[in-house]
Amino acid sequence: METIAKHRYARTSAQKARLVADLIRGKKVAAALEILTFTNKKAAALVKKVLESAIANAEHNDGADIDDLKVAKIFVDEGPSMKRVMPRAKGRADRILKRTSHITVVVSDR
């Protein structure tokens, strides 16, 4: 049984979050949580929270055994970017993109 959890509009770029997602793809959830606990990146905390939510969803909604679960799929899509202005010298301005992402974790007992 596949169970999904999503974090939409996460305040990190998809490029940075994908680095963390690649670390746990296909792993057992216990090993994945351990990897995320000791990964020194902001995105690791966000991905860990989504993974814990997916595990809780599987246990509560589907009655799955946590020991059998593995990360079947994990992907990070780009969300909308917030445009901001950074003042520069001589009256100019640069545009800053505050990027967001959508993190999706699918756990499965198969």
From Swiss-Prot:
Domain of life where this protein originates: Bacteria
S-S pairs: none
UniProt GO cellular component terms: cytosolic large ribosomal subunit
Protein's UniProt keywords contain Metal-binding: no
Recorded GO MF terms: rRNA binding; structural constituent of ribosome
InterPro entries to which the protein is assigned, alphabetical: Ribosomal_uL22, Ribosomal_uL22_bac/chlpt-type, Ribosomal_uL22_bac/org-type, Ribosomal_uL22_CS, Ribosomal_uL22_sf
Record keywords: Ribonucleoprotein, Ribosomal protein, RNA-binding, rRNA-binding
PROSITE patterns: RIBOSOMAL_L22
Summary of subunit composition and partner proteins: Part of the 50S ribosomal subunit.
PANTHER family given in the database record: CHLOROPLAST 50S RIBOSOMAL PROTEIN L22-RELATED, LARGE RIBOSOMAL SUBUNIT PROTEIN UL22M
NCBIfam families: rplV_bact
Similarity comment: Belongs to the universal ribosomal protein uL22 family.
Protein name, UniProt field: Large ribosomal subunit protein uL22
Organism from which the protein derives: Pasteurella multocida (strain Pm70)
